[in-house]
């Protein structure tokens, strides 16, 4: 086993990963034919019940903080639009990213209300409530930390419902508080619900290319319950969800951004999914019904997250909500890598240089394995004459050949697989970094230096992939080889070119990691070879032994 054969192993692992990702993308949930529906009527949390027939439109109320711009429809009090002011739609754009939207082409809303026997949002009780607002727009003033938007509705029975949205400075969590003042003469049975509704098929303006080259990022629903910390739920799943739990949350996810309803922790809640239209999907919760006696008041509340997937803030809002950051099947490596990267960034202030430092750290930790790898390869090269003589002596007796080879390895204390172990360990780290770069919103539009303005996107001029290919070429030329097969030699010759082509579409942050890793390999290679020379296991005078 030598360095150039290791390149074949890397290529095999890499191609296997590419095939697996391509299969995952091809077999991802496929949207049904689009049938656009624009409505502010909820499914009320019961898949068997039909939505309320369309009724008169309410007034649109605009709400602005330092990080959010929301549009609330007074018909039902749903949030129909949400713009994230700190996140541009595209690199260099002054237009903020729009997460929630209500247009003829696309619907993505955060709905909430009161159902139950006497709930004003119950379809059996007529059209959804038309709330009254004191203002048409609300803006968080300078120096103020909290903004409250109260909406009021008086039912036919005289009951007064106050729905208050509470937003805080530099926060993406929106508290939705209900106060029910039962001024009627009969008890009110009410159930609080919150749900997210979205068109399953993305129109062109919403398709931001989250299916990056060889990477499929999840777009769909998810939930957390007492039994499952984090469970994805595809839009095209036939069986509707029905889970009763205490605490937890329901969410809709996409690359970098999420919306989530977090119900109150006291009492139990039922999580559900429904399809209110051919091209619509919902996920939501229903709380335990409460009874408000005549003359009494009752408070019900839930919290909506609408914003970027900021792991620290999401974890503070609800347990396991930070798991919505999609790091794929290598999340257990990606998460600590991101925490380390974020810690380094806190001192340096540049994500690109942080990636360089984390590369040195990873390669430093793995140096003992790298040294063992090169030592094992050197010993294997020293055994080549004995192995060749053994082949000539034994001939075609494969069983005897295998037995004597293993005996030789044992007597010489050589592990034939010793050169593979570091590669097997490095590959998951490489892929975990890939997922981290594509799943962490902190790296979205994060600049490095010179022409690299977005570490999560490919190099626009392909300079980094070419540099990566050059470093691979030098590693190949500096590595001793025992490859004699002409076909393998040709494959080795073109390996840097093949990898360069692969990396043309990879995130520049990942290519940067690989370049630095290759440079560290060259340095470590020279240090290790000097030690091997002293032991008589390596000669700089010739590349073939």
UniProtKB/Swiss-Prot annotation:
The chain crosses the membrane at residues 6-26, 342-362, 417-437, 455-475, 496-516. GO terms for biological process: protein insertion into membrane; protein transport. InterPro entries: Membr_insert_YidC, Membr_insert_YidC_N, YidC/ALB3/OXA1/COX18, YidC/Oxa/ALB_C, YidC_ALB_C, YidC_periplasmic_sf. Keywords: Cell inner membrane, Cell membrane, Chaperone, Membrane, Protein transport, Transmembrane, Transmembrane helix, Transport. It is a multi-pass membrane protein. Pfam families: 60KD_IMP, YidC_periplas. It comes from the Bacteria. It is found in: Cell inner membrane. Residues 31-54 are annotated as: Disordered. Interacts with the Sec translocase complex via SecD. Specifically interacts with transmembrane segments of nascent integral membrane proteins during membrane integration. Belongs to the OXA1/ALB3/YidC family. Type 1 subfamily. This is Membrane protein insertase YidC. It comes from Serratia proteamaculans (strain 568). The lineage of its organism: Bacteria, Pseudomonadati, Pseudomonadota, Gammaproteobacteria, Enterobacterales. The gene is yidC.
